[in-house]
Amino acid sequence: MARKLFCQLSPFCYRISVEKEIMLRNLRDLISPVRFAEHREEEPLPALIKGHRSPMLRQLAGVDMQLQYNKETNLRLAGERIHGLIIEPGQTFSFWHTVGRTTARKGYLPGLTIGAGRLGAETGGGLC
C-alpha cells in the first residue's frame, strides 16, 4: 500500500497543507524581485485596446443553477478589485495577488469548481 501524503489524511490535514502553500507563496512574493501591479486609476483611460464579452450564465448538465448565479457575484467582487488597475512596464499582473482570498467574509459565495477531475462547489468558485 502506497504511503499517503499528509494532505490526504483528512480534510483538516488538507486545510493545513493549503495554508502552508499559501504562506510559502506569500514569502516567495515578499523576497521576489517581481513587482506586482498595485496602482489604480479611478478615471477611465482614453482608449480601449481590447474588449471581450462572454455569457455569464450557462445551464450545465447536473449542475445546480444557483452556482452559476453565485459565479456572477464572485466575478463582480473580483472585478471590483481589478478594475482600474494599471500594469506599468516591468510589473506583473497576478490575479490572486490582486484579488486575494475569496472568503465568505468578503462576500464570496459557493461557485462551481473542478478539481481532481470532479465538479464541486467552493466559496469563490467560478472565477477560473
Feature map (PLM): residue ranges:
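Well-ordered beta-sheet/strand-loop patches within structured domains
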Residues: M1-L127
